[in-house]
């Protein structure tokens, strides 16, 4: 007798058929394709490729130091390998040519065997990984902007000098002008010439400033009129 399947049972049967079909196609791909089959069988064996790397034949120093290194390591077990290499290098230099000659002959024999075993061998040194530079240089626009601001400040606060004042007095006033940040603080620094220094604050009235300027007028004749009007205009 035939059984009528419900909608849920029919849906489950279709899903199972789809799963079986996907598994069958994946197995066929692994068996039919030689490259995929090689990947399936040799998965995880990529690290073993480094073991097949052909080593260089030993030279005379390596032939001599092979036994000497063992002796030094047994006599000094706490010595590091780098220190042992330094000692062996110094001892090798102290040997005469007659003492080195047997090791040169052995090295030539090993090189001949190496050429016979690996006729197409070529030495390929491993390249060291370059460290990534994390520090980034500042953009060139920042330095050029800073220089332009400095030049602009020099043009703004530069003023000439005459015979009435010395260069030292003007250089001192220039330093005071550069160290100030507000116009009123600049005027207060200018109103302190040295021996007869007066105290000027932001609370002083325009009349007091005018009186002080009239009293100190001989010392500040060299200041330009445009600068004084720009700083003392209310």
Curated annotation (Swiss-Prot):
Annotated region (Disordered), positions in chain: 121-143, 184-203
One Pfam entry name: HMG_box
Principal location listed in the UniProt entry: nucleus
Protein's cellular compartments: Nucleus speckle; Cytoplasm; Nucleus
Keyword annotations from UniProtKB, A to Z: Activator, Calmodulin-binding, Cytoplasm, Differentiation, DNA-binding, Nucleus, Sexual differentiation, Transcription, Transcription regulation
DNA-binding region: 54-122
GO molecular function, one term: calmodulin binding
Gene Ontology annotations of biological process type: cell differentiation; male sex determination; positive regulation of gene expression; positive regulation of transcription by RNA polymerase II; sex differentiation
Any one annotated GO CC term: nucleus
InterPro entries: HMG_box_dom, HMG_box_dom_sf, SRY, SRY-related_HMG-box_TF-like
Subunit annotation: Interacts with CALM, EP300, HDAC3, KPNB1, ZNF208 isoform KRAB-O, PARP1, SLC9A3R2 and WT1. The interaction with EP300 modulates its DNA-binding activity. The interaction with KPNB1 is sensitive to dissociation by Ran in the GTP-bound form. Interaction with PARP1 impaired its DNA-binding activity.
Family: Belongs to the SRY family.
PANTHER family assigned: SEX-DETERMINING REGION Y PROTEIN, SOX TRANSCRIPTION FACTOR
Protein purpose: Transcriptional regulator that controls a genetic switch in male development. It is necessary and sufficient for initiating male sex determination by directing the development of supporting cell precursors (pre-Sertoli cells) as Sertoli rather than granulosa cells. Involved in different aspects of gene regulation including promoter activation or repression. Binds to the DNA consensus sequence 5'-[AT]AACAA[AT]-3'. SRY HMG box recognizes DNA by partial intercalation in the minor groove and promotes DNA bending. Also involved in pre-mRNA splicing.
Annotated protein name in UniProt: Sex-determining region Y protein
Annotated source species: Felis catus (Cat)
């Amino acid at each position: 007798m035939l059984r009528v399947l419900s909608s849920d049972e029919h849906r489950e049967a279709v899903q199972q058929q789809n799963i079986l079909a996907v598994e069958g196609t994946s197995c066929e791909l692994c068996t039919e394709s030689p490259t995929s089959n090689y990947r399936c069988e040799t998965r995880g064996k990529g690290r073993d490729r480094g073991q097949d790397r052909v080593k260089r034949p030993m030279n005379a120093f390596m032939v001599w130091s092979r036994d000497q290194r063992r002796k030094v390591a047994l006599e000094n077990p706490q010595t590091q390998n780098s220190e042992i290499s330094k000692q062996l290098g110094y001892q090798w230099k102290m040997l005469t040519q007659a003492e080195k000659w047997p090791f040169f002959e052995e090295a030539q024999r090993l090189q001949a065997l190496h050429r016979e075993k690996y006729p197409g061998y070529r030495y390929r040194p491993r390249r060291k990984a370059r460290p990534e530079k994390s520090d980034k240089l500042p953009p060139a626009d920042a330095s050029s902007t800073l220089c332009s601001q400095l030049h602009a400040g020099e043009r703004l606060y530069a003023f000439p000098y005459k015979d009435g004042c010395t260069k030292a007095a003007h250089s001192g006033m220039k330093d005071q002008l550069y160290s100030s940040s507000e116009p009123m603080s600049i005027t207060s620094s200018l109103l302190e010439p040295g021996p007869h220094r007066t105290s000027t604050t932001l609370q002083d009235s325009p009349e007091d400033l005018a009186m002080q300027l009239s009293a100190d007028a001989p010392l500040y004749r060299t200041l330009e009129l445009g600068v004084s009007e720009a700083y003392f205009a209310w």
